Each structure stands twice: as C-alpha cells, then as structure tokens.
Amino acid sequence: MNRLKLYLLALTALAVCSAKADEGMWLLQLMQQQHSIDMMKKQGLKLEAQDLYNPNGVSLKDAVGIFGGGCTGEIISPEGLILTNHHCGYASIQQHSSVEHDYLTDGFWATSRDKELPTPGLKFTFIERIEDITDIVNLRIAAKEITESESFSSTFLNKLAKELFEKSDLKGKKGIVPQALPFYAGNKFYMFYKKVYPDVRMVAAPPSSIGKFGGETDNWMWPRHTGDFSMFRIYADANGEPAEYSASNVPLKTKKHLNISIKGLKEGDYAMIMGFPGSTSRYLTVSEVKERMEASNAPRIRIRGTRQDVLKEAMNASDKVRIQYANKYAGSSNYWKNSIGMNKAIIDNNVLGTKAEQEAKFAKFAKEKNNTDYMNVVAKIDEAVAKTSPIKYQQTCLTETFFGGIEFGSPFMVMDKLKEALEQKNDSSIEANIKVLKEVFNDIHNKDYDHEVDRKVAKALLPLYAEMIPAGQRPAIYDVIEKEYKGDYNAYVDAMYDTSILANQANFDKFIKKPTVKAIEKDIATQYSRAKFDKYTNLAEQMGKLPEELALLHKTYIRGLGEMKLPVPSYPDANFTIRLTYGNVKPYSPKDGVYYKYYTTTDGILEKENPEDREFVVPAKLKELIEKKDFGRYALPNGEMPVCFLSTNDITGGNSGSPVLNENGELIGCAFDGNWESLSGDINFDNNLQRCINLDIRYVLFILEKLGGCGHLINEMTIVE
C-alpha cells in the first residue's frame, strides 16, 4: 500500500477518535466516510447525513452560501431573503450612505420590495456541486504532465477547473463558476461548481449603535451585546437564473430556506454551524508559529495602529470623513486587534509548547518507522523558515504601508506607455492612454477617498516604515527623500500630494490638455509608485522558490501526522470552502475566579451604555423598548430578552454570518465572532477556551419587528415556536 493511500485511510480512521470534542471544520462530502455524522448524532443531531448534504437532491447546504467575497450568508425565506452579519454588510451599508442618508447611523429598513436597494458589485454564491478530482491530479503527476509542486498551484488548478467544466453537463448554464482546490496540503483535491447571483439588494440593517454596539472595544470580546446582523435579497431573471441587475428581475425562489426556531436554548444544547471558514494554519511547526508572530502580526499591529489613529481623529472631526472611511477603518481594525489577540493567546495558551510536543512525538514516530523523509521534514521546514522570515517581515511592512495604508499613487505603467506614445507622436496611443488615466483619476478620487486624510496617513507611515526597515532595504524613494528633501518626510509628502499629475482636478486637467514627457518624468507620484512596486518585485524574487519548497514539505509533514495516529485533527485547514462544525451551547472560565455564562441579555446593553462614547450609544427607541420590556414573543420565560450566546463550534474569519442550527437544522443564531482568549485558535484549537460568539435569532427578530417595523419580512419566514 503506497503512502498516500495509507495517509487517506488514516484520515478516515482517525475521524472518530482523533479530533478533540467540538474541534473540526468538516468537509460535507466526507461526513459518512469519516463517521463525523455518527459523532454529531451522539451529541444530539436528529437529522441524517443527506439532510445536511445531498449531492443528488436538496439539503441544508442549499440554504447557505458565500455573501460577497469573504462572509457567509443563509437563506431565511422562500423569496431569497439573506441573513448575514452587520459587519459583512457594512461595506454595502456604507456604499449607500451619505451625510443626507446616513444609514450607518440611522439604519435602513425597506418597507416594501421596491424600496430594496440594488448594490452594484455584491454577489451571493451557492455551491452547486462538489467532486473529488484527486485521482485526476495524481494521474497528471504520474504522467509527468506536471510536477508535484505544480499540482497545487493556482495556475494548474484554474486550468484544470476550466478543462473539467468544459466537459461537464453544467457547461453553458448561467452563473456557473468552477474552482479546483487542494486539501490536506495537496494530498486531496476537490472541484467546486459555484452558482453566482450578481443582483443582491439591501433590505434591512440596524443602526451601527446596534449592529456595531461595543465597537472596537468589544470586538473579539465576551460578554457581548452586539446586534450584528443585516439582511439582503437575491434577485434573478424570470426563470430563476442569475442575471445582472435589471428592474425586471424578481426575488429568487430558492431551493431551500432555513426554518427559524424561537423555542430558545439552554446549556448543553446541540449547535452546528455551516459556512465558509477562510483560513487556518493548524499544522504549523514551532518555527512557523514564531514567524507568524514576528514577521506578520507584529509589524501589522504597529503599522495599522498608527494609520487607524490618523483615521479615527479625522473621522471624529467630520461626518463626511466618518462615512467615507467607516468600512476601511472597520476592516483594518478587525485584524489589527486579531493580530494583537493572537500573539497574546499564543503565549498565554503555550501554543509553542504544544507544537514542540507534537514535533517531539513526530520525531519519535519517524525514527521508529525509519522513514528518512519524516525524520528530516521538520528540520527542513525550519531551514526554509529561517530564510523566509526576514523576507516575509519586509513584505508585511511594505504591503501594510504602501498597499494597504497609503492610497494615493500613480499608474506608472500607464505613464510609461503615454511617455512612449508622446515620444513617438502616436496620437491614437496618446488618446488611449489619457482615457485610461481619466479612469484611474476617477478611481483614486472616488467618493470614499479624502486627499487630505490620506496625506496625513502618508506623513505618519513613511517615517514609521523607515524605523522598521533599515536603510538599503527600503524603496528608492527613501534615497530621494534623504537627498532632495534632507530627510523631511512632510516636505516630500506635501510635494507629492500637491504637485503630482493625479493630485487634484486642476493638475490633471492641465496635464491632459497638454501632456509632456518632461511632466511625466518629473511626476513624484509616478516615481513613488514605481519604487514601491520595484521593491515588491525585488522581495518576491528574494523569496523565489521557497514557498513551493515549504508547500511540498508540508505535504510530507501532514501525511506523516496522519500516519502517526496521534490525536490530531482529521480535517484539512480552512480555505474558504463550505464546512460544518458541531458542538454545544456552553459557558467558559478564562482564568481563575472568572466564569462567563453562556448568554447575555438586553440588561447588559443598558449597563454598558455611555452617551459620550460613540461605541456605546444606545438608540432612544431601543432603550425605551428595553425599559418597558416590550419584547413580545421573543423574551425568555423570566421576561429577559436574550442578545448573544456562546457555543463550542470551531470557526474562523469567513464564518461571519454563518447560520447556527439546532438538532433539527433550525436556525437559532448567526455566528459573528470568536473570544479573545482563543485567538490562537487558527493555529491551535483549545477545547477549554475556544468559543464561538453568536447572535441569538430572537434578538434579530425583536429588532426587526419592534424597532425596524419590518413585520412583512417576518411574515416571509418559517417560524417554529
């Protein structure tokens, strides 16, 4: 029996006994083979495997999809109504907001279908079909059509996906997008046929004082009182097929929608989550965990924190800027705080010690097996990481500063083409490139960009980058700053933001009226952009083949861990594909003398209220409803109104918006966060500390009905009392 088959058998055999209780981001298509369905039933599930995932029929899988490009959403009515998180819909809410119509502050409630807002660029994606293509890939390797490392490259897999799609019965059907992906570090491969609906409209969103209550302070924290939800609707053509926005489109008649339970929950109740976890790294070695901490998290924390201070000051001073930068700030601060929490949790939870123990056990196993590949693999990973870490640190600093931090710049490649056209006096090429420049100018100076705010960001980040990266390793602009501006960063930034061709409308109009080679050569923003891209390319060249080498080493290491038959997870790392995690409603104790119960109520909202702090403002109407205890049928038997609850489910980024389901597959909540103490969970799952923070569906319905006046939406839903 070859090693790959032995490894795959080990995966199946380990499934029942290997993963700790509640740990696991399980592949739907392997539930029966790996016996995970049996474990779910032992914990309380009352459904069969085909109720969750049925390749030949309709199942719960068909009510769950990808919301936008990085979240999960679920269908909660036969009319294509989507429930997801407020923070998942935040970009769309911000997109529709203005000082005159401030939906971020005031909320948005569509009182009828014709009031639902088209949201250009927003899509909802269902998984139509999943196929195992491992044998196809392995045959290509055996035939030497590709190398082993090429087998899990996006170049090969995208080409293979297109090839298989061309032979599929789904070819020619509207909205189908094929995707082939590696699993278990390239030991398994699956093909996903996705159905993408591009007409998604905004239906409901509470005010940010509900949807983001607690803000940055409460993010990743428990106890939680955030009403983190928003609602959208899928529209389709008259045949129910995907179609770009049209006034004639109609709400999608969905194959499946989730029933909603308001029966309540108690400690120990079964809870499962279906969704699209984005990325985990559960199989890292000690050296790789250290690299994550020092080369990725640490510089990200420092650079984002500095930028966010600038943005926050500007946002507090202007409602216009607050709306412009709301989504940018939220996206930045989310993983800024995550990085802080991850580094702290790695230390507090002794993740390095746990990984070292695993490596020691693996070394013993490899020696007993007399397997040279296994005996050497960790040392080879460590050698590679010693080379990648300093480069990765530079890459993080570069991308966080110049690509994720400072927005202004110039399309130097377009400028080069225009310069060449001017030199050759090629009128058609000049006209074509100026047309592109006009598009770029409008793209830079879009409604969510403030040139003066970005100027302040640049003045803060350019000197910070110089502190973090030694001379000789920085982009070439630092030589210019030193020589031509005598090290004065503010003077350099002002020159770029005042005099560059794309800096403002007057400069741009003057240039396109009479473009010259000299103006392009002197343009500071063009020089700046070229320098940052040159440095990016230089670092990629330094990294060279090291990522491919590490990928192959990981394939060996993970195969060996499977064969070792240790209590290791038998599920692959998350890669934004559909997964299922099961567990229970459960409290936790993060440290001696501290005990957190498993749910919160609206009492905590009033306890946290602070009218002087934007993060803890309570809307007057909500406060009135709470004080009057006007909760309707959604209250607990004792009269309290539940807000959030904890479960032991295994989630990560991408699961935001995922449905939390009870033993009958009924919706009881919407997952939206993890707890602070377990932020090392992407690297190592800790059963005692890992908790998923969920929004109670009863609070969603209460806000929708009592505050939003959206009884018509509730009437669409199937409510189980």
Curated annotation (Swiss-Prot):
Biological process, per Gene Ontology: peptide catabolic process; proteolysis
Where on the tree of life does the source sit, at the highest rank? Bacteria
Q: Which UniProt keywords apply?
A: Aminopeptidase, Hydrolase, Protease, Serine protease, Signal
Q: Where is this site: Critical for substrate specificity of DPP7?
A: 674
Please indicate if the UniProt record lists Zinc as a keyword.
no
**SUPFAM superfamilies xref list:** Trypsin-like serine proteases
Residues annotated as signal peptide: 1-21
User: Which residues does UniProt mark as catalytic?
Assistant: 87, 228, 656
Pfam families annotated for this entry? Peptidase_S46
Q: Which GO terms describe its molecular function?
A: dipeptidyl-peptidase activity; serine-type aminopeptidase activity
Gene3D superfamilies tied to this protein: Trypsin-like serine proteases
Q: Which InterPro entries match?
A: Pep_S46 (IPR019500), Peptidase_S1_PA (IPR009003), Peptidase_S1_PA_chymotrypsin (IPR043504)
EC assignment: 3.4.14.-
Give the protein's function: Catalyzes the removal of dipeptides from the N-terminus of oligopeptides. Most potently cleaves the synthetic substrate Met-Leu-methylcoumaryl-7-amide (Met-Leu-MCA), followed by Leu-Arg-, and to a much lesser extent Lys-Ala-, Leu-Asp-, Leu-Glu-, Leu-Lys, and Val-Arg-MCA, while this enzyme does not hydrolyze Gly-Arg-, Gly-Gly-, Lys-Lys-, or Gly-Pro-MCA.
Q: Which family does it belong to?
A: Belongs to the peptidase S46 family.
Q: What is this protein called?
A: Dipeptidyl-peptidase 7
User: Which gene is this protein's source?
Assistant: dpp7
